[in-house]
Amino acid sequence: MERQVKLQAKNVRKTYGPVVALEGTSIDLLEGEFLTLLGPSGSGKTTLLMAIAGLNDPDSGEIWIDGELMTYTPSHQRGLGMVFQNYALFPHLTIYENIAFPLKMRKMSKSAIDEQVARVLSTVQLPNVQERFPAELSGGQQQRIALARCFVYEPSIILMDEPLGALDKKLRDSLQREIKHLHDNLGITVIYVTHDQEEAMVMSDRVCLMNEGRIEQIGTPSELYFQPKSIFAADFLGESNLFAGKVVRQAAEGMTIERADGVAVSGICDDQVSDGETVHYMIRPENIRVSLDKGSEENFARGKLKETIMIGQLTKYFLELADESELVATTLTGSHRGSLQDGDEVFFGWSTNDARIMLGS
């Protein structure tokens, strides 16, 4: 069954004096979807979230929620839930009172409130903390309570503004999975804001990558990672080898470009380009095979192994080419133990299907 559109932002524009924070931004959010707004500081992701929440009026454009035009509707009338990085729990109220607060505002009966609070605390796996105060809980537990308070009144859409940003990595990783499980089990609709690429990749059904007030690309995490549409997308999501070249051949099996140093390599291109045109080439480090001998891959680069860095289970190899430019390959630690030494002449090889060729900046 086709999912309904829960939210639409149409050509939303927002300026602060001469600064354009959002430039004609449009997105659709489907029912039950987990959509992440991802981008660096100043990309416009929080500005867009605040416009959707009704906390920041856009200069122009439209915001539709559940089929109703709500561009300038007050925040409390939009039926949305919000979770912030600072938890926003009332320190003088117990956990029960914090979670019950939105239900009391909706004038629910005491028995219904008791039932809902117990249910949502069980959902976030903190069933025995009703009488405690926020200060008695850890940061991770407080964030779970903030989530519980948001879930308890079953908002149409939940907006999350970098809710895990203040937590350490281990706890952040754990709560990422927990939020994703809650989303999957409850079927809630979520818009999530983060600058953390890994967080976006782990949690999202789709990612909306933003840069300088514009949407660079929207798609599944896999699409953005393996099929970036711009240099910014290729560079922002994960690590990549990027270089320019001129188109010398186009065929069904791929496009061939030539670098300034004369090295020719092939990849997949979705753009319409002409022979002789300058384009950009991307290959992910994990898709490169490192060897002392030339392998069977369609593409290869030969050079001096400049540096080897072990990072736990992964090892990075830095290859210096004849023009002193650099390529990086990543392999599982131990796969070349003892066989490769810094200073060796080595080959980096990769498949045409793993490389992307793109226009633009």
Please identify what each model-predicted range represents:
Residues A53:
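Helix-to-loop junction immediately C-terminal to a conserved catalytic motif
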Residues T46-L49, I145:
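ABC ATPase nucleotide-binding domain helices that frame the ATP-binding cleft
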Residues G61-L69:
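Conserved ABC transporter NBD signature motif
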Residues L38-P40:
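The feature captures the beta-strand-to-loop junction immediately N-terminal to the Walker
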